[in-house]
Design a protein with these regions (language model features):
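N-terminal cap/lid segment of alpha/beta-hydrolase-fold proteins
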Residues: 5-44, 48
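Short coil/loop residues immediately preceding or within conserved phosphate-binding loops
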Residues: 19-21, 132, 145
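Loop/turn elements at helix/coil->beta-strand transitions in domains of secreted/extracellular proteins
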Residues: 31, 45-48, 88-91, 131-134, ...
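N-terminal cap/lid subdomain of alpha/beta-hydrolase-fold enzymes
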Residues: 35-90, 95-98, 109, 152
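A catalytic-pocket lid/entrance helix-loop region that shapes and gates access to the active site
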Residues: 70-73, 113, 138, 145-175
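Alpha/beta-hydrolase active-site loop
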Residues: 76-77, 109-129
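Alpha/beta-hydrolase fold nucleophile elbow
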Residues: 129-142
């Protein structure tokens, strides 16, 4: 079994396409801004891994030298590493929450509105021509908590969540 599994996530020779500051329209007329990182696969369609958060999608994070993950110009705090994921056939979509980073509006962290915005961003992404229609979410801490909230709304295109180090019980974990 292990011999078969070792080749599952091996990188391919995809080139990386980077789209910065892409506008995502929301149901209430507001917009969010996202950075999209995707494999250059011609007509091939890819699933997307998304996150939303207030930590500025453009803010570069450099990991310590002793981590397996190596620095690259596309890393951001507690989000998916697009260099790693895109090489394996996934797109990464990093969204600034309303009122944070480049997204205009009033910031309301951990709110129902943020979950609705994430729902809209997921469904918008699923309809893009390069997307297979399948969306997963990934992130650590705050980005993990956002996944629980949007999953509760059951966006049709959301197929998986990967919440790392987030709260499982908001009341118990925060009070």
């Amino acid at each position: 079994m292990i011999d078969k599994a070792k080749n599952v996530s091996q990188p391919k020779d995809y080139k990386l396409i980077v789209e910065k500051d892409v506008k995502i329209p929301l149901r209430d007329g507001a917009i969010l801004y996202a950075d999209i990182f995707r494999p250059d696969g011609g007509a091939e369609r890819f699933p997307a891994i998304m996150n939303i958060g207030p930590y500025q999608k453009d803010r570069l994070w450099i990991p310590p030298d002793d981590l397996e993950e190596k620095a690259n110009p596309h890393l951001a705090w507690e989000t998916a590493n697009p260099v790693w994921w895109c090489a394996r056939g996934y797109a990464c979509v990093r969204v600034d929450s309303r009122g944070s980073g480049k997204s205009p509006g009033l910031s309301d962290p951990s709110s129902y509105q943020e979950a609705v915005d994430f729902y809209d961003a997921i469904e918008w992404t699923a309809k893009l021509p390069w997307c297979s229609g399948s969306i997963g979410t990934l992130g650590v801490s705050y980005h993990a908590n956002c996944q629980w909230r949007v999953a509760n709304l059951q966006p049709p295109s959301l197929k998986a969540i990967i919440p790392w180090e987030g709260r499982a019980d908001l009341y118990r974990d925060q009070t």
